[in-house]
Amino acid sequence: VTATDETTPTIADVDRLVAWMDAEGLGTGAPLEHGYISGGSQNEIYELRRGDLHCAMRIPPPTAPAERDAGIVREWRIIEALTGTDVPHTEAIAVCTDPAVLGRTFYLMGFVDGWSPMGMERGIWPAPFDTDLEARQGLAYQLVEGIALLSKVDWKAKGLEDLGRPDGFHERQVDRWTAFFERIKGRELPGFDEASAWLRAHKPLDYIPGIMHGDYQFANVMFKDGAPARLAAIVDWEMGTVGDPKLDLGWVVHTWPEDTSGGEGSVGGYVDMTGMPSRAEVLEHYSKQSGRQVDDIDYYCVLAKWKLAIVLEQGYQRAGADPKLQGFGPVVLDLMAAAGELAESSDYKG
């Protein structure tokens, strides 16, 4: 058993977990080694080793709302659906919906051998991507290739017809998120009205429903060690659904710096974007890999900025003394202003 301190979350009942694993034929009879990896208010992740089995367990903490159990099942259905596809993903091993085992629904997925951009110290890429800018470019191309491959998965054949409501997806976006914003509203957000009106008046050129991640970015993928850059897995499917996969592309590029040659403009949030491909090159790569046009990317970028601003505003409105959530305040204002500005300046006519 991995040593933990009093503040580190622990598995509710290891004996019951072992008994369940025995019943599932997962490392039967061997001792279980387990350790906490990471977590938050919605999910905890533990590393498990038992015999030849090496996996990760994803489970809501005891304090998470009851609906997270259904969310865990949704995540499980998506990673299970990716089995046999060319989308880099974690192996789907087993799911448990019986609260008698650990009190919450959980699933086991293959342990990913690689690294996460979220684990980088001070936003510095691991070797060789810290100094080899040509190799670093591959990280960006692999990032968008992941969602290009995801967009081509036959979600109906994979049994995901009831996962989302793809019909009318774009028609619902503005109404749904405007209503959400009205419920949490604590201040005016300049740019909101302009972006909302523009989104109501425009649509994508060709909406083709598919599996979408919902929060696609460097923070939610893992790469294999060493060069060349190779995507190991897309992770954290909390927002996954069947909708418009091209919104994932908008999520990636709406903050992509125009200039990646270096300096302040090349810092894309938590990672150093110096030496990365240009926004146009990233879009071209997605288009080539997915077979989709990207002429309507302004629509997706306005929607991404507008929607992300509303999501983060909820965190800011309930921040209290939490410095991380307080920090969302100015970020939200910048995002919504940028959404309004892009809506007013874009020449997209769709």
Q: What do the PLM-derived regions correspond to, one by one?
A:
Residues T2-G27:
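Juxta-kinase regulatory segment immediately upstream of eukaryotic protein kinase catalytic domains
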Residues T2-T8, R183, S266-P277, E281-Q293, ...:
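ATP/Mg2+ or Mg2+-diphosphate-binding catalytic cores
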Residues E33-E194, A201-I211, G226-A229:
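ATP-binding pocket architecture of kinase catalytic cores
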Residues G164-R165, R292-A304:
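All-alpha amphipathic helical-bundle segments outside canonical DNA-binding/catalytic cores
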Residues I211-H213, F218:
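Catalytic-loop of the protein kinase fold
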Residues V235-G240:
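Activation of the activation-loop gatekeeper triad in protein kinase-fold domains
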Residues D248-D259, G263:
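C-lobe/activation-segment region of protein kinase-like
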